[in-house]
């Protein structure tokens, strides 16, 4: 059976974690305190009970610092928390006379709201900030909202949002920087037809720069069309724009992803010849390209090139080398690189473990047992994986009949204050119900809803079938009531973007 957090344990979590007599500074922020606050917020049964009284009781306003607020919001974002909870916490922080809000905290709150399609609340927050804290409005906050509107809305709605920001929120005449943000919104969603249309329609007004052209070039590259990328590059040059190192980096990445590693290396040589700055990021891209080309010797040569050029390899460079070795089937070599990385004092991150998991899954030598070993190492480091890794591990555990490991992963995520992705819940529910463990599946679904996230229709139907056969329909009715309450606070299917 899946164990609930006991009432005593939860009360310990709710014990005041911050002393009202001392303020948290950037040097004294404690990871455990951040985690405990995240668990309190994420685990609170909102909207059934208001969250502000809990915040007031357990987080004294006098103890809040801008860094602490930003760290908590960052954890709530990573934890896929309900947007309204994040908004309530941000608003609570505004009550502190000692802690002025920061752009970072505002942007994180806005991002959490927009990601969950709470557009009414996002616009209201923008308007409130415009009125009370206008200095918090930034290019980044504009980009966050426009990108999500471009994702969930239409071409026309995105343009209307751009005009609304100019006239009602920022209240100034927009220039090329804002124009670039609008283009990036469409390019991020790989809507290159729309991005090109915007460019042709408005470029005479905004006088585009090389950054404008690089944004469009990146859009074509991300759309996976290397031919269109190169055609636009030549158009860019024809229009009189001078390519820079960013331009070359985009083109190199495009060729690497399309397995045209030779062309990527030719561009790299051109960069050297033209005396462009060679960055760790450029070399990291080429290391990834070596892996795609299944050339582990070149991957190592390029990695060593970083130090030869007086640069310092970062976690991303090590991850690229490990990933390339994994693609070439050299799992043992990747393990050695990970040890080398740790010896240099560079901490492995979620991408490191994701690469290790993928490599071991494909390896006959390490296989499932190797994944389990590194899963435990990840937990020992208190490292929380990103959503793709969670879903991948859940699928692996459940499909290999190790449903208890799936439950262990679920419990670990909740203990860290995270609400696992809906697809992870579907995988776990399917495996549990297939093994006649409907009560455990119900508990996972209840925990999801309690944290302000809805369960999918397939999950509910599986529970309905399994619990009906066990004569436990009362549980199902309770869950249905909670879902209906939650739906009243979630954005409707037909959302208002403006």
From Swiss-Prot:
The entry's keywords: Repeat
Source organism, top-level taxon: Eukaryota
Keyword Repeat: yes
UniProt GO BP: mRNA splicing, via spliceosome
The keyword Repeat is assigned to this record: yes
PPR repeat boundaries on the chain: 102-132, 138-172, 175-205, 209-243, 244-278, 279-313, 314-348, 349-385, 386-420
GO cellular component: mitochondrion
A Pfam family assignment: PPR
Similarity comment text for this entry: Belongs to the PPR family. P subfamily.
PANTHER family: OS03G0856100 PROTEIN, PENTACOTRIPEPTIDE-REPEAT REGION OF PRORP DOMAIN-CONTAINING PROTEIN
Name of this chain's protein: Pentatricopeptide repeat-containing protein At3g61360
Source organism per UniProt: Arabidopsis thaliana (Mouse-ear cress)
Lineage, opening ranks: Eukaryota, Viridiplantae, Streptophyta, Embryophyta, Tracheophyta
């Amino acid at each position: 059976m899946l164990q609930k957090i006991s009432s005593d344990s939860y009360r310990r979590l709710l014990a005041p974690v911050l002393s009202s007599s001392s303020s948290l500074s950037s040097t004294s922020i404690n990871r455990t305190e951040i985690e405990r606050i995240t668990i309190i917020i994420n685990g609170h049964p909102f909207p059934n009970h208001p969250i502000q009284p809990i915040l007031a009781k357990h987080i004294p306003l006098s103890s809040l610092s801008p860094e602490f607020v930003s760290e908590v919001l960052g954890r709530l974002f990573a934890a896929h928390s309900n947007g309204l909870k994040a908004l309530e916490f941000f608003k609570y922080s505004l009550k502190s006379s000692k802690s002025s809000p920061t752009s970072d905290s505002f942007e994180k709150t806005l991002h959490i709201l927009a990601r969950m399609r709470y557009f009414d609340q996002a616009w209201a927050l923008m308007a409130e900030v415009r009125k009370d804290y206008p200095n918090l409005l930034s290019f980044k906050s504009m980009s966050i909202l426009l990108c999500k509107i471009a994702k969930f809305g239409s071409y026309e709605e995105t343009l209307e949002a751009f005009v609304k920001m100019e006239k009602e929120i920022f209240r100034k005449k927009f220039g090329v920087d804002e124009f670039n943000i609008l283009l990036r919104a469409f390019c991020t969603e790989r809507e290159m037809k729309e991005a090109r249309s915007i460019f042709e329609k408005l470029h005479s007004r905004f006088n585009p720069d090389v950054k404008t052209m690089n944004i469009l070039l990146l859009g074509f590259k991300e759309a996976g069309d290397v031919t269109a990328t190169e055609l636009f590059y030549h158009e860019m040059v024809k229009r009189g724009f001078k390519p820079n190192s960013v331009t070359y980096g985009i083109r190199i990445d495009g060729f690497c992803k399309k397995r045209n590693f030779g062309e990527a290396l030719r561009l790299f040589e051109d960069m050297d010849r033209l005396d462009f700055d060679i960055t760790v990021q450029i070399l990291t891209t080429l290391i990834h390209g070596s892996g795609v080309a299944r050339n582990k010797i070149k991957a190592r040569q390029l990695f060593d090139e970083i130090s030869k050029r007086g640069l310092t390899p970062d976690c991303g460079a090590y991850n690229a080398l490990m990933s390339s070795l994994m693609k070439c089937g050299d799992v043992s070599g990747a393990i050695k690189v990970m040890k080398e990385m740790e010896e240099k004092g560079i901490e492995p991150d979620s991408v490191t473990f994701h690469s290790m998991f993928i490599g071991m899954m494909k390896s006959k030598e390490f296989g499932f047992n190797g994944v389990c070993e590194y899963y435990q190492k990840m937990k020992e480091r208190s490292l929380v994986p990103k959503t793709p890794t969670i879903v991948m591990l859940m699928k692996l555990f459940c499909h290999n009949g190790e449903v208890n490991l799936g439950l262990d992963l679920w419990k670990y995520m909740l203990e860290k204050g995270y609400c696992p992705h809906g697809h992870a819940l579907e995988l776990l529910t399917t495996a549990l119900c297939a093994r006649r463990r409907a009560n455990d599946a119900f508990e996972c679904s209840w925990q999801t809803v309690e944290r302000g996230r809805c369960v999918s229709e397939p999950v509910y139907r599986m529970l309905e079938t399994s619990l009906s056969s066990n004569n436990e329909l009362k549980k199902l009715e309770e869950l249905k009531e909670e879902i209906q309450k939650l739906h009243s606070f979630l954005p409707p299917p037909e959302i208002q973007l403006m």
